[in-house]
From Swiss-Prot:
Biological process annotations from GO: cell wall organization; cellulose biosynthetic process
Gene3D superfamilies: Spore Coat Polysaccharide Biosynthesis Protein SpsA, Chain A (3.90.550.10)
Gene symbol of the encoding locus: CSLE1
Enzyme Commission number: 2.4.1.-
Its membrane topology: Multi-pass membrane protein
Lineage: Eukaryota, Viridiplantae, Streptophyta, Embryophyta, Tracheophyta
Protein purpose: Thought to be a Golgi-localized beta-glycan synthase that polymerize the backbones of noncellulosic polysaccharides (hemicelluloses) of plant cell wall.
Protein name stated in the entry: Cellulose synthase-like protein E1
Protein species of origin: Arabidopsis thaliana
Localization terms from the record: Golgi apparatus membrane
C-alpha cells in the first residue's frame, strides 16, 4: 500500500506559475446579451398581444384556444429565460501540462479508474476490454494507476475477457509508451492505422486479433475455454454453480498487481462483481460505484478517481494530466471537486442523424455552467477527488489517507465484505457518502450535492477529444435513453434535492437556472405537444392563432422566430456542425420533446402516485449488420413497436393531413387566406418537412428498419379520427 511519505509534493515548490488559466471572451458575450435582450422584449410583446386580443369578437372555443396558446407561450418565454443562464458567462480552461511535469515529475497522486458494465450481451466483452486497455495505457506512471472493472452482470465471460486483456496488456502498454500511441484503445488504433502498420505494430495487431478471436468465440459458444479455467482457477472458483446475474456472491480478483515494489510495468487491474440478492435492492450503477469506492480504498486508494462507461475509451492519453492541472493547482484548484470532460462518440454519422453529440451542449452550455460554478457531473469522463465524493465538505481538513491506515496483506474476504449487499444497511452510503441513490440520473444529483457542500467543478473540452464512446444507432435507443434522462432530471426537480430550494444560498443563481434547464426537460414536453397540435388543427379548421402578416403585431412573432432560428443555426455551425446536422438536431429536438420527455414526465408522475418504480435501462452498444449499414447511410431506423413511435406517427400524420387540407382549401380559394393564416402555414409546413424521414418509414420503405405496419395503421386511424371529429365541431 501507499507509504506515509507518499504525499503529493511539488518537485519545484518555488515555481509559482499556475497550472491552468481561465479565460473569458467579453466582446462576444456582450453582443449576445444585447441580442438576447432584443428577443426578450419581443417575447414580452407577444404576451401583451395575447392578453389584449383574448376577448375580441371570439367564440368560447376560440377564447379557450387563445388562452391555452397564451399559457404555452408564457412557458416558452420563461423557459427561454432559464436557458440564457448557460450562455451569459462562459469560461474556457487552459491547462499547462508541461508545468505539471516540471513541478511534480512522476510524483503524482494515485489514480483509480472505474469502468462499469452490466450486461455482456448489450455491452460485448470485447468492447469492454478495449476500454480497459485504453486506460491502462494512459500517460501516467503505471505504479500510480489502477483500473477496476465493475461487472454488475456477474458474467464469467466478462471475467474471462478481462483475463485475456491482462495478458495482452503486457504487450500493449509498453508498445503504447514506446511509440506514443493515440488512441490507446487497440481496436480504435489498429483500425485507424490498418494500411500503414510497421513490423512492431503488425506483431501487436496479430496478438490483438488472436485475443479478440478467443473472446468472441467464447461469447458465441457460451462457454469458457478449459485452459483458462485452470489458469485463473482462483477467479472462476468464486462463481457458485447456481449463480445468476441477479443472485450471486461478491467476486473479487486482482489480475495484475502493478503497485510499487512489483516488477510488472503495467497498472493494477482488478475485477469486481458485487454481491446481488433478489431480496436486496442493488441501486443500479450508483450501487456499483459505491462498492468500487469501498473496495478500491483497501487495495490502491487513489486520491483521484476517473469513472467511465464501458464503451468510453481513452482517445487522448494526455487528458489525465490536463485534469490534474486543474485539481493540483495550488491557488484555484483547491476549490475544484471534480473535472468533467464531454461525452463524445466515435460512431456518429457526418450529419449526426440522431443528434447524439449534443454539440451546443458541450461547446456552449457547459462553458456557461462552468462560469456559474461548474458543470453537471454526467456520469462518465469525470475525475473526482475521492474524499469529496465520499462526503468531505469544502473547507474541512483533508483526512488521513485510508491507504496509510491499512495493512498490505489485508485478507481478500475482508475486502469482499465491503461489496456485500448488506454492507450499506444503517450507513450513510447512497445518502451522505458516495453516489446518491433513488434517482435514474444518480450522477447529476451527486454532482449537485457536492456543489451544494461548497465545492466547484471545472469543465475541460480539449481539441483532441479525451474519451469516445458509442452513440445510439437507432431512433428507439436514442428515445429510450432520453426518456430515462428526462425522467431522472424531473425527479430531481420534484425532490428535496431540487436545485431551486436545495441549492438556494449554496450555489449561484446562474447555476440553479442551469440545472433547471435540464430538470424541466420532461414538463417542457406538454407545451411543445400542445403548440404543434393546436397550430395544425386550427389551420385545418380555419381558426387564426397569430396576427395578420400586415399587422404590426406580426413583427415580434416574426422576429423571435427568425432570430432564434438564425442564431441556432449559426451557433451549431460555430460548434463544428453542418447544415444537415442542424436540421437533424431540430428533428430530434421535436421528437425528444413529444415522445421521450412526454413519457419521462408521465413516468415521474406515476412514480409520485406510487403506480410504478424507476428502472435503469442500459443502452445497447451493438447493432445488427443491416441496421448498421442503414445508420452509416443516415437512414432513420424504426423497426420496433413502441408507444413513443405511436405518438410520433400520430402527430406526423396529423400535421400532414391538416396541412394538405389547408393547401387544398387555399388552392380552391375556399377560405384560405395566407395573410390571416400565414404563420400557421409556415409552422405546420415546417413540421411536415421535418417529418419526411418519418413518412418514408411509415409509407414508402420496405426494409426491416421501416415503421412497423401496426404502428402506421394506428397512427393514421388516430390522426384521421382527430381531423374528422374537428370537422364536425
Amino acid at each position: 500500500m501507499v507509504n506515509k511519505d507518499d504525499r503529493i509534493r511539488p518537485v519545484h515548490e518555488a515555481d509559482g506559475e499556475p497550472l491552468f488559466e481561465t479565460r473569458r471572451r467579453t466582446g462576444r458575450v456582450i453582443a449576445y446579451r444585447f441580442f438576447s435582450a432584443s428577443v426578450f422584449v419581443c417575447i414580452c410583446l407577444i404576451w401583451f398581444y395575447r392578453i389584449g386580443e383574448i376577448g375580441d369578437n371570439r367564440t368560447v372555443l376560440d377564447r379557450l384556444i387563445w388562452f391555452v396558446m397564451f399559457i404555452v407561450e408564457i412557458w416558452f418565454g420563461l423557459y427561454w429565460v432559464v436557458t440564457q443562464s448557460s450562455r451569459w458567462n462562459p469560461v474556457w480552461r487552459f491547462p499547462f501540462s508541461d508545468r505539471l511535469s516540471r513541478r511534480y515529475g512522476s510524483d503524482l497522486p494515485r489514480l483509480d479508474v472505474f469502468v462499469c458494465t452490466a450486461d455482456p450481451v448489450i455491452e460485448p466483452p470485447l468492447l469492454v476490454v478495449n476500454t480497459v486497455l485504453s486506460v491502462t495505457a494512459l500517460d501516467y506512471p503505471p505504479e500510480k494507476l489502477a483500473v477496476y472493472l465493475s461487472d454488475d452482470g456477474g458474467s464469467e465471460l466478462t471475467f474471462y475477457a478481462l483475463t485475456e486483456a491482462a495478458e495482452f496488456a503486457k504487450t500493449w502498454v509498453p508498445f503504447c509508451k514506446k511509440f506514443n500511441v493515440e488512441p490507446t484503445s487497440p481496436a480504435a488504433y489498429l483500425s485507424s492505422k490498418a494500411n500503414c502498420l510497421d513490423s512492431a505494430a503488425e506483431e501487436v495487431a496479430k496478438l490483438y486479433r488472436e485475443m479478440a478471436a478467443r473472446i468472441e468465440t467464447a461469447a458465441r459458444l457460451g462457454r469458457i475455454p478449459e485452459e483458462a479455467r485452470v489458469k485463473y482457477g482462483d477467479g472462476f472458483s468464486q462463481w457458485d454453480a447456481d449463480a445468476t446475474r441477479r443472485n450471486h456472491g461478491t467476486i473479487l480478483q486482482v489480475l495484475v498487481d502493478g503497485r510499487e515494489g512489483n516488477t510488472i510495468a503495467i497498472p493494477t487491474l482488478v475485477y469486481l462483481s458485487r454481491e446481488k440478492r433478489p431480496q436486496h435492492h442493488h441501486n443500479f450503477k450508483a450501487g456499483a460505484m459505491n462498492a468500487l469506492l469501498r473496495v478500491s480504498s483497501k487495495i490502491t486508494c487513489g486520491k483521484i478517481i476517473l469513472n467511465l462507461d464501458c464503451d468510453m475509451y481513452a482517445n487522448n492519453s494526455k487528458s489525465t494530466r490536463d485534469a490534474l492541472c486543474i485539481l493540483l493547482d495550488e491557488k484555484e484548484g483547491k476549490e475544484i471537486a471534480f473535472v468533467q470532460f464531454p461525452q463524445c462518440f466515435d460512431n456518429v454519422t457526418r450529419n449526426d442523424l440522431y443528434g447524439s453529440m449534443m454539440r451546443v451542449g458541450i461547446d456552449v452550455e457547459f462553458l456557461g455552467l462552468d462560469g456559474n460554478g461548474g458543470p453537471l457531473y454526467i456520469g462518465t469522463g469525470c475525475f473526482h477527488r475521492r474524499d469529496v465524493i465520499c462526503g468531505r465538505k469544502y473547507g474541512e481538513e483533508e483526512e488521513e489517507e485510508e491507504s496509510e491506515r491499512i495493512h498490505e496483506n489485508l485478507e481478500p474476504e475482508m475486502i469482499k465484505a465491503l461489496a456485500s449487499c448488506t454492507y450499506e444497511e444503517n450507513t450513510q452510503w447512497g445518502k451522505e457518502m458516495g453516489v446518491k441513490y433513488g434517482c435514474p440520473v444518480e450522477d447529476v444529483i451527486t454532482g449537485l450535492t457536492i456543489q451544494c457542500r461548497g465545492w466547484k467543478s471545472a469543465y475541460l473540452n480539449p481539441e483532441k477529444q479525451a474519451f469516445l464512446g458509442v452513440a445510439p444507432t437507432n431512433l428507439h435507443q436514442m428515445l429510450v435513453q432520453q426518456r430515462r434522462w428526462s425522467e431522472g432530471d424531473f425527479q430531481i426537480m420534484l425532490s428535496k434535492y431540487s436545485p431551486v430550494w436545495y441549492g438556494k444560498g449554496k450555489i449561484s443563481l446562474g447555476l440553479i437556472l442551469g440545472y433547471c434547464c435540464y430538470c424541466l426537460w420532461a414538463p417542457s414536453s406538454l407545451p411543445v405537444l400542445i403548440y404543434s397540435v393546436l397550430t395544425s388543427l386550427c389551420l385545418f379548421k380555419g381558426i387564426p392563432l397569430f396576427p395578420k402578416v400586415s399587422s404590426s403585431w406580426f413583427i415580434p412573432f416574426g422576429y423571435v422566430t427568425v432570430a432564434a432560428t438564425a442564431y441556432s443555426l449559426a451557433e451549431f455551425l460555430w460548434c463544428g456542425g453542418t447544415f444537415r446536422g442542424w436540421w437533424n438536431e431540430q428533428r430530434m429536438w421535436l421528437y425528444r420533446r413529444t415522445s421521450s420527455f412526454l413519457f419521462g414526465f408521465m413516468d415521474t408522475i406515476k412514480k409520485l402516485l406510487g403506480v410504478s418504480e424507476s428502472a435503469f435501462v442500459i443502452t445497447a452498444k451493438v447493432a445488427e449488420e443491416e441496421a448498421a449499414e442503414r445508420y452509416k447511410e443516415e437512414v432513420m431506423e424504426f423497426g420496433v413497436e413502441s408507444p413513443m413511435f405511436l405518438v410520433l406517427g400520430t402527430l406526423g400524420m396529423l400535421n400532414l393531413f391538416c396541412f394538405a387540407a389547408a393547401v387544398a382549401r387555399l388552392v380552391s380559394g375556399d377560405g384560405g387566406d395566407l395573410k390571416t393564416m400565414g404563420m400557421q402555414f409556415v409552422i405546420t409546413g415546417v413540421l411536415v418537412v421535418i417529418n419526411w424521414p418519418l413518412y418514408k418509414g411509415m409509407l414508402l420503405r420496405q426494409d426491416k428498419g421501416k415503421m412497423p405496419m401496426s404502428v402506421t395503421v394506428k397512427s393514421v386511424v388516430l390522426a384521421l379520427s382527430a381531423c374528422t371529429c374537428l370537422a364536425f365541431l
